[in-house]
């Protein structure tokens, strides 16, 4: 990977994709300096590595922000690289995965950077319902950058270092981080309902690989893999799953393959992906006899997510 071979951003890509499968796009792109004396600043790849590779043989497009380059901030060319990646992904019908570690807008580029945000938002909106969009927040994701995971289909957050916010917690009158950290993975998962999974970087990358293997590549594709499980096997422990339908669904699924969305939000309802005879199935189940508001919103949001897919429901 040009100019950033040893960066954490490139390491994350290498850990996510199948070995030696990554092909970089736009590795020689740097910032287009126009204002605020940026001419002498080094901006390798303009702070974001973009390209494509495979996960368990499936094509995916990936961008990974490099916090060592101006804090991973979004400038004009940084944004154009991400928007261009979306164009390639839509043409080939493959998912986009964003690995976010960004301090927000690059103030030195002013309105050029603001326009870049608009280009990314437009690309995401055009891809919505066409290809899966996945975002993992490993560091800071603040300001206008916070809209990007909100517009994607699946969001992951590093539980200790991930921070997701439009305004910092201290911007709320009478609040401070020690009182209520509204930027934390716990808050964004339990209260905002934005995060599907929170954990370590290794856990997140593993979960993304599992999720990609279950999802259709696009809205015209079917998610199907060869079933290696015994379709006639007995599920002896179903009686012990009465209190948690999530466990029940994982027992029913081929080889226990199971991915729960919005796991920390609206816990009275389970929304998940499982596999039955090799086919990916969307599942909605209740954990309690009465739905709360959050659980109902969660179920409706999940059905909207799958509205453009051809898969079955349970």
Mark where each language-model region is:
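Intrinsically disordered, low-complexity segments enriched in small/flexible residues
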Residues: 1-60, 64-66, 70-71, 185, ...
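Glycine-rich anion/phosphate-binding loops
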Residues: 46, 72-84
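Structural motif
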Residues: 61-62, 95-99, 134-137, 156, ...
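Glycine- (often His-adjacent) and acidic-residue-rich active-site loop
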Residues: 65-70, 77, 99-119, 288, ...
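Catalytic-core regions built around general acid/base machinery
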Residues: 81, 85-89, 116-127, 306
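Structural alpha/beta core scaffold segments of enzyme domains
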Residues: 88-96
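Conserved catalytic cores of soluble enzyme domains
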Residues: 100-220, 312
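Conserved small/polar residues in nucleotide/adenosyl-binding loops
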Residues: 303-310
